[in-house]
Amino acid sequence: MDLNAILIILGVIALIILVAHGIWSNRCEKSQYFENSKNFTREARIREPQENQQYQTADQSQSDFQRNLLETDNDCFSSESAHNSHQPLYHYSEQSAVQSVDQIKIRLPDSEPNYVMQERFSPKHTDYASMSIEELEKSIDLDEGINSSSQHLRQELAQISGQSIADDKVNIEEHMFTESTISFVEPQTNTESQQVVEKTKSGNSSFIMLYVVASENQGFSGLQLTKTLDELGFIFGKKQIYHRHVDLSITSPVLFSVANIEQPGTFDLTNIADFYTVGIALFMQSPSYGNATANLRMMIRAAKTIAQDLDGVVVTEQQEIFDEQAERDYLARVS
């Protein structure tokens, strides 16, 4: 017998041995698995369904809570949606920065199309953005937020007021805010919105401002700022600034807005990676759509959250620290 035949025979024998060993190993593993399954204690079998039941209960509770929120939102805005369903939609991006650190001039033209914006929202933590005004007013904790009455923050404000804010104020007044306008037009069939616009036309409206400024020699990164605004339910819109709507619907009224305090007051999303600003301004019209007190509380909560996330300071219209007394004074203006 030649060498080739011997090698072929040895190869076949080796292959048969490998196949037999694989089959034997597979059977051993299956046998061990079934032996282990028989050793499970009765306690372990009982614990698993109990844990599953707890998870199911928690999931069911969360599902019920979300369902209640959706039903509340639908009840609140179903009538408005029905009225507006026959009207054409005008796509818009709202805002041409309305703010300065001390003086901000805002005019309200008689007519302009309703703003419609593309929704950009990434919820995180508690979903305040999707809650209705009534739910938010009940659930909001007025004591939460930044401890803005601390001595450390007061020292930061004193430094900021003497440098960054003063410089930005001059630039804003000279180049931008004397020319900026923002309009809010009521839905034609919405009685409450009509009353707001009628007061605006009669000259009885005003704007309530809050500022969030960065620490000395620092600034807010565009990526971090836009991420925080998106998480709070703001939508980038007309005039290249952000707006907070009633229910994140592109047809719902605007409650308050956010703009850059640096000229020209806008947010350049095309170069957001290189965008920096020393601060932002939050402003709302008074009277506003719905409950003005609830809207103002929501704006204050948003300002505190932004300051906390970006290591900034909340400042009043008079460039003073926004403490508990200042918050009471602000709420008194709409009560």
Swiss-Prot record:
It comes from the Bacteria. It is found in: Cell inner membrane. The chain crosses the membrane at residues 5-25. One of its GO terms (biological process) is division septum assembly. Residues 1-4 are periplasmic. One of its GO terms (cellular component) is plasma membrane. The keyword Transcription does not apply. It is a single-pass type I membrane protein. SUPFAM superfamilies: Cell-division protein ZipA, C-terminal domain. Residues 26-335 are cytoplasmic. Belongs to the ZipA family. This is Cell division protein ZipA. It comes from Histophilus somni (strain 129Pt).
